[in-house]
A protein has these predicted regions:
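Conserved flavin/dinucleotide-binding core of flavoenzymes
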Residues: 3-6, 54, 60-232
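Glycine-rich loop(s) and the adjacent beta-strand/alpha-helix scaffold that form part
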Residues: 3-73
């Protein structure tokens, strides 16, 4: 189903590849068999906040001889200057006084809690926290780490954009790749064959979220449908 100009339309196809997120498939394919439905409950996704911070300069990092790094306290785990794309013969030079975008990655780990509970609580925090609170924490974190080398949040930050990813990263548990206790891996239940005219793809099934595995999984699923006889 989709809408266009305020009108709803229905699309029919002889075969379909379900390449959507693993947490949604069992709610879309309503007649999914028990084995596949159970398999889809075994895919776990962790939330992530990506903050893109527009900086008027990055001299405070340049003085330290770095363009990014990891840390272990406070908000976030990693920050780095984004690469500026260059096209054709264009030459891009970035000096310490150039305006740039600093990307900050924030994870929501709660060591000691079961994985699913960590993810559920993390998603709740990710979504419920207002922008102003994230902005305050970002300014405080950068000030705490870089004030000594000249960072001034009021002067240097031109803007902040937040991308809230509730199901950002696949989190494979023991048995995800090769099975457990003599039982097949849950991903293989979905990858090995189509469900009638429906095949399943998504980077979740590979355990490696990237554009490469997305293409490979899509090709595999399409091949299963093309190789199978379609009747009716």
């Amino acid at each position: 189903m989709y809408t266009q100009h305020g009108k709803a339309y229905q699309v029919k196809a002889r075969a379909v590849v379900m390449a959507n997120g693993s947490w949604t498939t069992r709610h879309i394919v309503l007649d999914l068999d028990a084995a596949r439905r159970d398999a889809y409950t075994q895919f776990h996704r962790s939330p992530c906040l990506i903050a893109n911070i527009a900086l008027r300069n990055w001299r405070f990092l340049y003085k330290m001889g770095i363009s990014g790094g990891y840390w272990f306290e406070g908000m976030g785990v990693y920050g780095g200057i984004r690469t500026v794309p260059a096209f054709a013969t264009e030459i891009k030079e970035i000096g310490p006084d150039s305006p740039v975008v600093l990307t900050l990655k924030v994870l929501f780990c709660r060591p000691g809690l079961p994985m699913e509970e960590q993810q559920t609580r993390g998603r709740a925090e990710l979504i419920s926290t207002p922008f102003r609170e994230y902005e305050r924490k970002i300014r405080e974190q950068l000030t705490d780490m870089f004030a000594a080398t000249g960072f001034d949040a009021k002067r240097d930050i031109a803007g902040i954009i937040l991308n809230r990813w509730g199901h950002a990263y696949a989190s494979p548990q023991p048995g995800f790749f090769f099975g457990k206790n003599g039982k097949p891996a849950f991903r293989d239940i979905l990858r090995n064959s189509a469900f009638g005219r429906i095949a399943f793809a998504n980077t979740d099934l590979s355990g490696d979220p990237s554009h490469v595995t997305a293409i490979e999984e899509g090709e595999r699923a399409a091949g299963q449908l093309l190789d199978a006889p379609l009747t009716g």
